[in-house]
Amino acid sequence: MPATRGQASLLSLDLVRNAPQRMDAVELMSRIPDKIAALVCFDPQYRTGLDKLKFGNEGSRQIARYRLPQMTDDVITFLVEEAQRILRPSGHLALWVDKFAIGSGQHLKYLRRSRQLRIVDLICWNKLDIGMGRRARCVSEYLLIAQKDPTKAKGVWTDHRIPDCWPESRNPGRHPHAKPHQLTERLIRAVTKKGDIVVDPCAGGYGVLEACQLSGRNFIGGDLL
């Protein structure tokens, strides 16, 4: 099957497909042409949770996460804008946030400059494991689903058995930021087709890459570590 115009232009760039690559998220996104991605999975290394909790002992209790490069809110907002640019019409952004981002409305600020992205769903990940917390202990993270205009579900979201509260044990040995593998693969299969391009600018342990390999999707992504 011949490459589409977007895929052909992508082949001319210095970007690795379907394999890990060491690259800053901003640089990676800037190299991707407009309107070629069906899905962008974005798991930023934000500090909202750590800053709210302020235990003062990050380096001893969460040393692996503590060592990860941190992203400012401005960088996250810019990368959401870049996601909007590279997404094709009706493509999706899957943005991971924590409860403090949801409670403070920070998740809306991340999308404030991306006027073509509409929030269409929210999935709670129940990690089945008690975490930190000065009050209620953290057992969840949230996956914000935004869709680029025009928004529609019929024919675009094909798996209607995904619950909005997803129970799946975390796998910290894989990567300190590892996200639920089964949910990731289900989501990729739900909103993309075989051969579509899935982008992950903060790939971490490359769980999205693995899900793309299992489902026959093309992966573009990288990380600094």
How should these model regions be labeled?
Residues 1-222:
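Core catalytic lobe of class I
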Residues 225:
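Conserved SAM/SAH-binding beta-strand->alpha-helix loop
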